[in-house]
Swiss-Prot record:
Residues 91-95 are annotated as: G2. GO terms for biological process: hydrogen sulfide biosynthetic process; sulfate assimilation. It comes from Aliivibrio fischeri (strain ATCC 700601 / ES114). The keyword Nucleotidyltransferase applies. It catalyses: sulfate + ATP + H(+) = adenosine 5'-phosphosulfate + diphosphate. With CysD forms the ATP sulfurylase (ATPS) that catalyzes the adenylation of sulfate producing adenosine 5'-phosphosulfate (APS) and diphosphate, the first enzymatic step in sulfur assimilation pathway. APS synthesis involves the formation of a high-energy phosphoric-sulfuric acid anhydride bond driven by GTP hydrolysis by CysN coupled to ATP hydrolysis by CysD. The gene is cysN. Pathway: Sulfur metabolism; hydrogen sulfide biosynthesis; sulfite from sulfate: step 1/3. InterPro entries: CysN_GTP-bd, CysN_II, CysN_NoDQ_III, G_TR_CS, GTP-eEF1A_C, P-loop_NTPase, SO4_adenylTrfase_lsu, T_Tr_GTP-bd_dom. This is Sulfate adenylyltransferase subunit 1. Residues 206-208 are annotated as: G5.
Amino acid sequence: MNSAVEQQLAELGIEAYLKEHQYKSLLRFLTCGSVDDGKSTLIGRLLHDSKQIYADQLDAVHADSQRVGTTGERPDLALLVDGLQAEREQGITIDVAYRYFSTQKRKFIIADTPGHEQYTRNMATGASTCNVAVILIDARKGVLDQTRRHSYIANLLGIRHFVVAVNKMDLVEYSQSRFEEIKEEYLAFSKKLNNPNLDISILPLSALEGDNVVNPSDALSWYQGEPLLEVLENVDIDADKGNGEFRFPVQYVNRPNLDFRGFAGTVSSGGISVGDEIVALPSGKKSKVARIVTFDGDLTSAQAGQAVTLTLEDEIDISRGDLLVKSQSNLQATDQFKAEIVWMTEKGLEPGRQYDIKIAGKKTVGQIDAIHHQVNINSLEKFDTQELPLNGIGLCDVSLTETVSLDRYQDCADTGGFIFIDRLTNVTVGAGMIQNLSDLSESKPINDNISAFEIELNALIRKHFPHWETKDISKLLG
C-alpha cells in the first residue's frame, strides 16, 4: 500500500475513506509535447512526490534504472510509465499509457502520449477523452513543431484548458528571462488557434529535480504561482460539463424482466430530470422521463458525465444507437456535413471510398466526397491535397447513407465526433470532428445505384486479385 493511502486510512477509517474517495471530482489530463521533453518523467515525479507509488513498484524502478535508465545513479521515474519493452529500450513513449492517482482534493487519470510525429494518431486517441492538456516545453529548445502540432490537435479535440509546463529549468540555471521568452513565444502562437475560450496557464518546473511539480522550489523563488499539482487540483471543469443541450445516446436496452424496460447510457451534455419531456430520434416519438435509475438508487436529475438508466412513461420503440433529446431541442438531422479528420492508417484517405462510420452508439455507412484542404499543423497553413496521408489532418465533406441526428463537435463531442472503420479489416482508420452541418435540402446522398454489398465485393476483388485490373466501382458510377 502506498504511504498516502495509508495515512488517509489511519485518519479516516476505511468506510469514511471510501465514501470521501467516491465523491471526489475526476480530472482526465494528458501530457504532450515534443520528443524528450520529459513527459514520462513528469508523470513519474507527480506519482513519486505525491506518495502514490507502491514499495514494490519503486523497487522495480530502481532495478530497471540500473539496466535501461537514463538518469545515472538516480532512479529513472519515467520507467513508471513507459511500460512497453520497446519504450524502455529506446527511451521513448510509443503507446498511450494511462495512470491513475488521487489527492485529498481530486482524482486523476493521466494519459501519457508519445511525442514522435509518427505516433500523432496515438496522441489524438489519448486527447479525445481529456479535460486538460499538459504541454511540455524543453527550456533549452523552446516552442518546437511538435509542440504546435499537439496544441493544435488538443484544441481541435475540444480541450479548453492548457497547462504549459516549461520543463528542464535546471538545465538553463532556472533563468527567469528564458522562461519569459518561451512564455511570450507560446502565447503568440496560441492566438493562431483562434479560440477565445482557451484557458492557458504557463509555469516553470524541473521534473527530474522535482522543482515546482508537487512542491514549490527555492530555485524558482521568482515564480509566484502555484506548483503544477495545485494548478491541476484547481482547474474548474464543472462549468464545461453543464453547458449545452441534453444529449443521451442509448448504449443498451435494459430489460431484466417483464416489468422493467430502461435505456442505459451516459449523459453526453446538459441535464435531465424526472418529468422532463423527451424525443427519441430518429423516430421522433415523445414521452416523459419516469425514473432515473442507478445502482445506488433513483435520482431526481442527472448531469453530463453520469451513467444512468432512463425509464419512460410510455412504451415507445427505442434501440441501441438511438438518441434521446429534450422536446424543445433544435438538433439537426442530415446526411452530409463538413468535418476535420485525423487519418490514422498507412493507406491514405481516398474520396469516394465507403467506410463504416460510428457516431456515439450508432453505426452507419459513409464516404468522403471531397477534401477541401490539409492543414500543416506546424505552421497552421492550409494546402490542397488529393488524399490525406497517415497522421494528416484536413477538412472534408462527408456523406452518409442515411439521415442521422448530429451536433457540431464543439457543441457536443459525443454526437459530433465519429470514427472511420475499414469495412474489410474492421480496423479504425480515422477520426472526425464535425464542424458544419448541411441542410437536408442541400445534402446529396451516396450513389443509390451501388449497394453496400457490391462496394465490398468490388473492394475484395481489387485487393486479392489485382491482376484482374478491376476498376473501382464507386468511382466509375460516382
